[in-house]
Amino acid sequence: MSADSRIAAITARIVERSKPYREPYLDRVRSAATNGPHRTVLGCGNLAHGFAVCSPAEKVALAGDRVPNLGIITSYNDMLSAHQPFETYPALIREAAHEAGGVAQVAGGVPAMCDGVTQGQPGMELSLFSRDVIAMAAGIGLSHNMFDAAVYLGVCDKIVPGLAIAALTFGHLPAVFIPAGPMTTGLPNDEKAKVRQLFAEGKVGRDELLEAESKSYHGPGTCTFYGTANSNQMLMEIMGFHLPGASFINPGTPLRDALTREATKRALAITALGNEFTPAGEMIDERSIVNGVVGLHATGGSTNHTMHLVAMARAAGIVLTWQDISELSDLVPLLARVYPNGLADVNHFHAAGGMGFLIAQLLRKGLLHDDVRTVYGQGLSAYAIDVKLGENGSVKREPAPEASADPKVLATVDRPFQHTGGLKMLSGNIGKAVIKISAVKPESHVIEAPAKIFNDQAELNAAFKAGKLEGDFVAVVRFQGPKANGMPELHKLTTVLGILQDRGQKVAILTDGRMSGASGKVPAAIHVTPEAKEGGPIARIQEGDIVRIDAINGKVEVLVEDIALKTRVPAHIDLSDNEFGMGRELFAPFRQIAGAADRGGSVLFH
């Protein structure tokens, strides 16, 4: 089925806007594919260094250009639960590559930080910038020009977007993303959130809180709520970087290993040495990007992807805007209720029908482009499947079920949870912002209240502990943008403001910083641009000004006369405390040149 005419029109607009960037990008991709990799043109010393530790048979294979070599880019470390399973993947990939007549080498490793560990800590100010560092680190690994395709091992928040930027920068190479899968279900996410609120209110101690957190985050795999990490997995599948059904299979299971083997063999099959050459830069086009945005809306995915998708698209010469994302939200229904948008976790989502059911439903209404290339072949309809373990450890795929196994978790396109998507763009005299409404109750979709000004999240937490946060208000938390301090997530404020909300106060957040993909019930107009450090209007808001956040009509404004607002002197604060410690001094150049939030907040693209 062809895409809905409205989806097609938005896609066509993106195509037209992107031409000055996309066409030169494709020229570079095709030139690189023609000129390399050709290991036989490497000097003998170069090549000897490249395969020094390989077996004699592998050296013979790599000395020519007829046996494909996979470059593995891994983000393994054993602190991140989602990345710990990758420890065994290189050996499994090498074995599968050998079975298929190829070779695989670890081309390089990239850093992988856990936002759950750094939340509310100085290290969080490196989080967004780590995405671009990951892209650059992967680029260094692939720069050896020894590889015919790359497989990318990554899961968490900034890691997958960074790896995707690298994959598209090396767009002449086929790219297959291989996930680790979610951890098994532990303490329900809503119960964990309740204990956090009780701790913030002083009603339980640290021991009780740590016990609850440990029962929630308890083993290998991705955190089970639907935050940025699991939104990453959805995106990689719906954009065609994953194999069908690969995203949400638990680690350490026979099916997980079978999918990893299959992904390896598929990566070898789509190199230029075979008959299905699928370079990543040509595979991912404007239709693929739109499919990613549609999936984000249909699942109530992470707000972080309003930045990451913009940066990922730009790496492929595609110019995606917040306006595109917002207009698509008006067309795409919400089909998933996964915490923080509901009580279920991603394991429940998968059991209800998962990605296969979701894709089938969206295709049926023409809300996705089916005519795309993927690592699995031509057409997204091949992803409308249910994946199982077949005989002899193979992967078996069947058509996705027509009915959801749990309508409270996964809805049909004819009976959605809401008729529009989970994310909206806001604009007004404060600038532009993004809001996630899928987890916010309808009565909180419009908030009009006096501003309380905070220049960091510590000030707000101190005011809460001092009992100073009374009545209705909008917490304006500013100087949190890319140029100010790297644009940290302010997720810990959700607990504090959630307590006030439960007491009957109408509260909201307005910030040039970010919120976690796990953030939920408190309305938050985030990613405000221009940011306060750049003298944006958010720096002109004063204590007591009435701020209106209207998610229904897409407005964010301070109710002050335009002339009065423009003549105010923007606030300036001393940010020197944010410049040192926990590695922040290393990122001073990044803060100086970082782009605006609506352009991806990147140092790579402006």
Swiss-Prot record:
SUPFAM superfamilies: IlvD/EDD N-terminal domain-like, LeuD/IlvD-like
Pfam families linked to this entry: ILV_EDD_C, ILVD_EDD_N
GO (cellular component) term, any one: cytosol
Keyword tRNA-binding appears in the UniProt entry: no
Record keywords: 4Fe-4S, Carbohydrate metabolism, Gluconate utilization, Iron, Iron-sulfur, Lyase, Metal-binding
HAMAP family the record matches: Edd
Protein name: Phosphogluconate dehydratase
Species of the source: Rhizobium meliloti (strain 1021) (Ensifer meliloti)
